[in-house]
A protein has these predicted regions:
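Conserved CoA-thioester-binding segment of acyl-CoA-metabolizing enzymes
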Residues: 1-28, 53, 212
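Hydrophobic alpha-helical membrane-association signature
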Residues: 5-9, 58-61, 91, 214-217
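A general structural signal for well-ordered alpha-helical segments in protein cores
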Residues: 6, 62, 122, 215, ...
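Terminal peptide-recognition signature
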Residues: 8-9, 27, 40, 75, ...
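Catalytic-core regions built around general acid/base machinery
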Residues: 12, 61-73
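Glycine- (often His-adjacent) and acidic-residue-rich active-site loop
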Residues: 29-65, 84, 112-114
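Crotonase-fold acyl-CoA enzyme core
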Residues: 68-230
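Short alpha-helical scaffolding segments that buttress acidic/His motifs in well-ordered protein cores
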Residues: 137-138, 236-240, 251
Length: 251
């Protein structure tokens, strides 16, 4: 994300809150590679990091966007079209619902790339996955597959986006669907390695990406939300979001 993008998002969420013809907000990224992989580290290294006040300004802008999502009067669906990493993970968690491509990846990057995950993950990631997983994610920066993310409660649903040459949708072959490893540790959604990984890469070689099923699931969620009473829905969103806001406002 860049300052221009963040400023635009802040204004967009405010406008959506006030628009009577808006049923819900869908927050997504362009293309099929990533929803968001965090801040432009080159940008703030060159422009912001030389002055503490400038870095504070940079982070305040991002924080205002997260707050804008949490206070939006309309439900917010995160359409995860690819990687949701770093600041992207934090933006996504601020949303009310997450529907993801099964090729998406989730996690943090801060301690490995010169920052800290203080834009939401240190505040409320544990509300989704528990303090043990949250600590590991924030410090080790190891990523979850989309399958692991839905299994641990980080997202609502995943859908296939890879299309084989014969036109069939196939599930992401890069992840294991085994529930446990040889020692009994949870392993659902673990990334394959070694020869299994090479075989999975070969299976993907002839595939194309088609996001039509992802769009259909997002549309279905939006339709379900449209069947609720707007005022009652807004009050319910406000009440459930209090749990995230309680932790976020300590930031």
């Amino acid at each position: 994300h860049t300052p221009d993008m963040v400023q635009g998002a802040i204004l967009a969420f405010r406008a959506a809150s006030n628009a009577r013809d808006v049923n819900c907000v869908v927050f997504t990224g362009a293309g099929d590679k990533a929803f968001c992989t965090g801040g432009n580290t080159k940008e703030y290294a060159e422009y912001y990091a030389g002055n503490p006040q400038e870095y504070k300004q940079y982070m305040r802008l991002f924080n205002d966007m997260v707050t804008g999502i949490l206070l939006c009067d309309k439900p917010v669906i995160n359409r995860v079209n690819g990687m949701r990493i770093g600041g992207g993970q934090e933006i996504g968690m601020a949303c009310d619902f997450s529907i993801a491509a099964d090729t998406a990846r989730f996690g943090q990057a801060g301690p490995k790339h010169g920052s800290a995950p203080d834009g939401g993950s240190t505040d409320f990631l544990h509300l989704f996955v528990g303090i043990t997983r949250a600590m590991a994610s924030c410090t080790l920066c190891e990523h979850w597959s989309a399958h692991a993310a839905v299994d641990i409660g980080l997202v609502n649903k995943i859908v296939p986006v890879l299309k084989a040459p014969d036109g069939r949708f196939i599930g992401n072959p890069m992840v294991s669907l085994e529930r446990f490893d040889a020692w009994g540790n949870p392993a659902y959604g673990a990334f394959k390695s070694g020869t299994e990984r090479e075989a999975a890469k070969a299976a993907m070689a002839g595939c194309t990406t088609d996001l039509s099923l992802l769009d259909a699931e997002v549309e279905a969620m939006a339709y379900k939300l449209s069947l609720t009473m707007p005022d009652c829905l807004a009050k319910t969103l406000e009440s459930v979001r209090k749990k995230k806001l309680e932790h976020w406002q300590r930031n």
